[in-house]
From Swiss-Prot:
Binds 1 lipoyl cofactor covalently. It is an enzyme of class 2 (transferase). Its EC number is 2.3.1.61. It catalyses: N(6)-[(R)-dihydrolipoyl]-L-lysyl-[protein] + succinyl-CoA = N(6)-[(R)-S(8)-succinyldihydrolipoyl]-L-lysyl-[protein] + CoA. It comes from Solanum tuberosum. One of its GO terms (biological process) is L-lysine catabolic process to acetyl-CoA via saccharopine. This is Dihydrolipoamide-residue succinyltransferase component of 2-oxoglutarate dehydrogenase complex. One of its GO terms (molecular function) is dihydrolipoyllysine-residue succinyltransferase activity.
Length: 20
């Protein structure tokens, strides 16, 4: 993701949408 987890996407792009 890149849809939801902006901050998270930076470190865990594969969980960007999962974490939120």
């Amino acid at each position: 993701x890149s849809n939801s987890g902006d901050l998270v996407d930076a470190v865990v792009p594969y969980m960007g949408e999962s974490i939120s």
